[in-house]
Amino acid sequence: MKKLGNIKQIVSAYDVVFLNGAESGKNCILVHTGELEVLFNKDNALDISWVKYKGRNISFLSKNGINSVSGTFAEKFEGGFLYTCGMDNVSSCVENKPIHGSLHYRQASEVYHREENGTIVVGGKVRQTALFGSDLVLNREYTVSENGIRISDIVINEGYTADKYGLLYQINFGD
């Protein structure tokens, strides 16, 4: 590291906004850590849209790709490396909720990224609320190293009553 001109040559994070096509307007963070390239989607619960390892894609994107489309689940499902399902649809007692839940379609707030000892830390909050219903906050933080991704999720109930919730991490591998 002493002879390195700038740490961003090997470890970096950049805010990215897509400008064209169906993904136009999507806000993301693109992270490079040597062997890994990871795209975090701020507009979709800070889920991971894609991962490349040593330059090779290891995640699945559907035909829809990253998009800003409104419509049915089948019309807007992106796939992505990490697709978080929940918090209102993951349990045996839930009925009449959308497939995969609504969390993925909620924007992250208070989003940050920083370099920390050769890793990149990315985090933010995702709030799932309803009038006369839930007030749940997902505090999400990732640590991306040269060849690994660690996730830390903490759910806080900011409502006035107890609330049931669940999270399911759908990992989509592809090539």
Regions found by a protein language model. Give the residues of each.
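Surface-exposed acidic/polar loop and edge beta-strand patches at domain peripheries
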Residues: M1-R150, E158-G166, Q170-D175
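Conserved kinase catalytic-core segment
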Residues: V155
